[in-house]
């Protein structure tokens, strides 16, 4: 699948992706600051609520290094993930999304694309893949929160059929900000 000039692939997240996912999240100022343990728990098949975790990877060529503004707990810099067998994967993880499921609803808990990879349609491809996964899991409505000041994300979500469903006052901290609650009908 192509996103702009990039060759990308969306797939399920696995344990070997966690260091890179963690690094991407901590390189983005407004991304949720989960611990590695939280990302690992999202991969557990028996976790409640059940989660779907996806990553998007590309060819891995010509990437700008990630810049982390502060020292993240458990931070380990890695360039490429490996498979369970220890072989290098063909692509470099450049973004991820995690949704929690309580059918018939799901909540998109986080979607993060590395800064240097934004504006190439990668987030749109990842959101489309997540919507397909959620539909296959008997979800008929997806919800998400987005910072009220994040006009680029709001515009992208609206263009993909998401609708504003309300506001969550002072939902975000550092800096404190309202969240726009959005919903998407699936299926």
Regions found by a protein language model. Give the residues of each.
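Conserved beta-strand segments that form the floor/walls of ligand-binding pockets within enzyme
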Residues: 107, 112, 121, 143-145, ...
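Acyl-donor (CoA/ACP) binding surface of acyl/acetyltransferases
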Residues: 120, 124, 139, 168-171, ...
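Conserved N-terminal entry element of GNAT/NAT acetyltransferase domains
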Residues: 1-16, 180
